[in-house]
Amino acid sequence: MVQSVLGSLVLGYRPLWGRERSLVGIQLFVRSDGAAQVDVAHLLHTLQEIWSASSPPLLLTPQTRQLLGDMLAHAPRNAPWICVPGPWLAESAVYASVQAAHQRGLRLVWRGELGNLPEPDIARCFDNSLLSLRPEDAVAALQAAPPARPGAPPVAPQGTSPVIDGQMYENVASRALMEHCLDQHKALALAGWPVEDVLYSLRHQQMQPAHAIILKLLKAIEAEQSLEIFEDILSEDPLLAYRFMV
């Protein structure tokens, strides 16, 4: 049965990173495979079965209005967070489904641009937001809290940051903006990571495996754990995994 319901879907994922720079959740994108009818109730039950208590929380992100409507209608109260695109709420059917789901106790996340927040009567239906930063938002945020540069005098802040405390953010393109969201405004999570900017800032440094993973591996070796345990630990660090593969 698991194979049948997952076989009718196209799935994608994106890590959600927290203030400790560790994984705090997974955004799971869900789309039906062609014209196949998706049994959403069965899908939610399957996820509940295969997702253990130690697994990171899920943010379900349906890619079609039909899937969203089915999730809002059939999800139980203890279901994962469900992401709702802000522009879709202009349709009365979607808005009515969101209101009904909120009244049933579902945890909903509004997704849209920081500069186009929902009205209060809509916002109260949502537990959190996944906000997209526009270029002008990024500029305003960094001007309000200019990042320190080694050897340079501090720059006076200009204006106030548009970043809202405690929300989730996406389209964060720079390391400085990432630190601004997570550290200064206590963002709940960052969807994705400013990979290109981080790699560029480390271009002259030789990367090393994470110290915590090395210690964990040494303890497993001392305890004479199985090869499977060693492989699991190695897989937690990309650099270690690559070195042992080659």
Question: How should each PLM-predicted stretch be described?
Answer:
Residues 41-45, 90-106, 147-152, 230-234:
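Hydrophobic transmembrane alpha-helix bundles
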Residues 59-63, 80-90, 105-115, 127-138, ...:
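Catalytic beta/alpha-barrel core
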Residues 70-73, 93-100, 118-123, 140-145, ...:
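A short acidic, amphipathic alpha-helical/loop segment
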Residues 77-81, 103-108, 123-130, 159-163, ...:
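Glycine-enriched alpha-helix->loop->beta-strand junction motifs that scaffold or abut catalytic
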